[in-house]
Amino acid sequence: MPKSGKRKQAEVEQKPKSATKSAKISNGLKETAKDPYPNHPRPTAEECLSVRDDLLAFHGFPKEFAEYRKQRLISRDADGTRISEPSDLKESVLDGLVRTLLSQNTTEVNSQKAFACLKSAFPTWEDVLAAESTCIEDAIRCGGLARTKASCIKNLLRCLLEKKEKLCLEYLRDLSVDEIKAELSHYKGIGPKTVACVLMFQLQQDDFPVDTHVFEIAKAMGWVPVEADRNKTYLHLNQRIPNELKFDLNCLLFTHGKLCRKCIKKGGNQQGKESDDNSCPLLRYRM
């Protein structure tokens, strides 16, 4: 997941005050996407709302995503329709994409350090493209998989320059979700999760990335069949979760997965917020 971004409006999205609000929630279905589990009825819109509210009450909204949340507010009108993009964006789409690439298979701290080192060594993307691959590898080595990631970044920049004659992805802001997915999928090393993160964070689109934390929690709650893999989980959840809940719910599930010992596979994180397994707000949703 990317780090915090930018937005102006101080207020955060208002959560519904009563369960009756859920009746107004749209189903968020995408006409062009196919649900691999059309007969699996969960999660319902009401369940998504309830989980969102329970996690929000338990954790508060994660500070690392607060600025992205503000961006979403100022890029939409009163009824939630997307309008013009914020004018004060500090992070370009290309920056966000590379940042997400560097976050693969490493910790948040290491990926942030790798991106900072890359930008320090090569201030512009033209500098990165002109650099030797070994130099890029050295700059991002702290993030792991340096050779693979350096090759992916170089290939992305090379193909982008050939296609658009400049190193810029801002044109994606004018495309539909399906068009954005088609564009980014052409680049080697950019998978569904990376695309979904860019859609949700940099482009303020309604998408629901599925990382390890979200995947494990979704399976534990029975939101997908036990045999589901991450790609099918992504397709199913994007069909089932209402668009207006996707951003908050995704950020909260990701954060909860990092902090809750009960929800962490193999009990890895010892810095979890919950000292008592029974305090996990998701226990009542588990199968």
Show the residue positions of the predicted features.
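N-terminal polyanion-binding entry modules of DNA glycosylases/AP lyases
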Residues: 1-175, 242-245, 251-287
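Catalytic DNA-binding helix-loop module of base-excision-repair DNA glycosylases/AP lyases
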Residues: 95-102, 153-155, 167, 175-224, ...
